[in-house]
């Protein structure tokens, strides 16, 4: 694993009205089968694992991610771009406000295994 900090962080604006400022703090390079854990100041965790074919961007959506008090959601913006977001359990109202401000369409919560099976698997494939 190699981390190259961006000092000072590069800042850029984004969002539906360019009203969100993001700070790019650096670049991390992972080799296949290396993992990093991202943590919030309140203890939420997210594991990202590098494989030789790409990345596991999240732990299992309907098991381990939930145990970290995070919930995956698929959203679509006004330009038609899709994003997978991870919402902290205790920050649902902040997420709802953000989604409304950014005109995000909630497509599907990704943490309900039964719901995902109903949505994506044909009868008899379960």
Where would I find each of the regions flagged by the language model?
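Intrinsically disordered, low-structural-confidence terminal and linker regions
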Residues: 1-27
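A generic structural signal for solvent-exposed, polar alpha-helical segments
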Residues: 9, 18, 59-62, 88, ...
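Feature targets compositionally biased, intrinsically disordered low-complexity regions
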Residues: 14, 25, 42, 71, ...
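Acidic, low-complexity, intrinsically disordered interaction modules
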Residues: 25-105
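Short, mixed-charge low-complexity intrinsically disordered segments
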Residues: 52-57, 100-126
């Amino acid at each position: 694993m190699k981390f190259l900090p961006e000092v000072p962080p590069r800042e850029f604006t984004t969002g539906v009205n360019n009203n969100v400022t993001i700070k790019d703090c650096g670049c991390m390079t992972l080799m296949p089968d290396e993992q990093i854990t991202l943590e919030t100041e309140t203890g939420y965790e997210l594991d990202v694992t590098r494989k030789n074919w790409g990345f596991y961007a999240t732990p299992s959506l309907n098991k381990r991610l939930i145990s970290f008090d995070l919930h995956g959601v698929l959203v679509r913006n006004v330009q038609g771009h899709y994003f997978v977001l991870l919402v902290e359990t205790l920050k649902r109202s902040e997420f709802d406000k953000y989604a409304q401000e950014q005109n995000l369409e909630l497509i599907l919560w990704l943490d309900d295994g039964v719901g995902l099976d109903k949505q994506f698997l044909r009868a008899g494939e379960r």
